[in-house]
Curated annotation (Swiss-Prot):
Keyword entries, A-Z: Glycosidase, Hydrolase
Species of origin: Escherichia coli O81 (strain ED1a)
CDD domains linked to this entry: nuc_hydro_IU_UC_XIUA
Active site residues per record: H240
InterPro entries per record: I/U_nuclsd_hydro_CS, Inosine/uridine_hydrolase_dom, IUNH, Pyrim_hydro_RihA, Ribo_hydro-like
HAMAP family xref list: Pyrim_hydro_RihA
Example GO molecular function: purine nucleosidase activity
Full protein name: Pyrimidine-specific ribonucleoside hydrolase RihA
EC number per UniProt: 3.2.-.-
Length: 311
């Protein structure tokens, strides 16, 4: 039986490719998709979810828009990374359907209530919507199998020296998620920076030759340009968000450790930092499965294989 998942995302190039991968995988049953503000404004990330589902001919999937800002802070967006639309690069179709007439939290709650088995929440943006769900519906915690997030790192940052972007946008929300008691799986920069897509991988995807693989290649063309900055020291572009889906499909591609994780919400230099107790110094019981390594070639091969689904 396919694993039921609920995807909360802020497309964003890598979020879009995570959607592509999830919907090409019969092992997963995507029950709903909710959008969060993050990589772009809430209006644009919602539109991008609708555009991607229109492209993939999956307008049957319920979609809802989430919180317009973080729990306690002003919104920060990553338009310098993802462009004015949030998905700059390819010519994507305009949406042919509308979102549900409800909030993201309402759609999440409805999805959990209606599911006959616990649902895995995959969150590839800031954790605002998930935190609001957890706070407003404690009775539904038992309906959540796990929360798989793209966010954080062990002592590494890509937005500040200490913080990864998704966690930095709403650290209070991330702290709620990590301390919820629900199993959390963390795909942080330690693993996603190893999941780099190279130029030759992009050409491999393009050569598959179907409309979706072509769009994915064009998304990566744009994404690669940003990551050419020598400050990163990258060969290609880290494909952050699809690591969450890839872990669900092929966990054997990833090396993980069980550790306690907390989120710094007040530090002068470290707001948004995920504090990973790697050496068990706090005495706290592990609350997260933390990805630390990936078989890069296996990851690329998985994506290439699933792109053929859209032929």
């Amino acid at each position: 039986m396919a694993l039921p998942i609920l995807l909360d995302c802020d497309p964003g190039h890598d979020d879009a490719i995570a959607i592509v991968l999830a919907l090409a995988s019969p092992e997963l049953d995507v029950k709903a998709i909710t959008s969060s503000a993050g990589n772009q404004t809430p209006e644009k990330t919602l539109r991008n979810v609708l555009r991607m589902l229109t492209l993939l001919n999956r307008t049957d999937i319920p979609v809802a828009s989430g919180a317009v800002k973080p729990l306690m802070r002003n919104l920060i967006i990553a338009d310098n990374v993802h462009g004015e639309s949030g998905l700059d690069g390819p010519a994507l179709p305009e949406p042919t359907f509308a979102p549900q007439n409800c909030t993201a939290v309402e759609l999440m709650a409805k999805t959990l209530c209606e599911s006959e088995e616990p649902v895995t929440i995959v969150s590839t943006g800031p954790q605002t919507n998930v935190a609001l769900l957890l706070n407003s519906h404690p009775e539904l915690h038992s309906k959540i199998a796990r929360i798989v997030i793209m966010g954080g790192a062990m002592g590494l940052g890509n937005w500040t020296p200490a913080a990864e972007f998704n966690i930095y946008v709403d650290p209070e929300a991330a702290e709620i998620v990590f301390q919820s008691g629900i199993p959390v799986v963390m795909a942080g920069l330690d693993v996603t920076h190893k999941a780099q897509i190279h130029v030759e991988d992009t050409e491999r995807f393009r050569a598959i030759g179907n409309p979706v693989s072509t769009i994915v290649a064009e998304l990566l063309d744009f994404f690669l340009e940003y990551h050419k900055d020598e400050k990163w020291g990258f060969v290609g572009a880290p494909l952050h968000d699809p690591c969450t889906i890839a872990w669900l499909l092929k966990p054997e591609l990833f090396t993980t450790v069980e550790r306690w994780v907390g989120v710094e919400t007040q530090g002068k230099y470290t707001q948004g930092m995920t504090v990973v107790d790697y050496y068990y110094l706090t005495g706290n019981k592990p609350n997260a499965t933390v990805m630390v390594d990936v078989d890069r070639q296996g990851f690329v091969d998985l994506l290439a294989d699933r792109l053929k689904f859209y032929a």
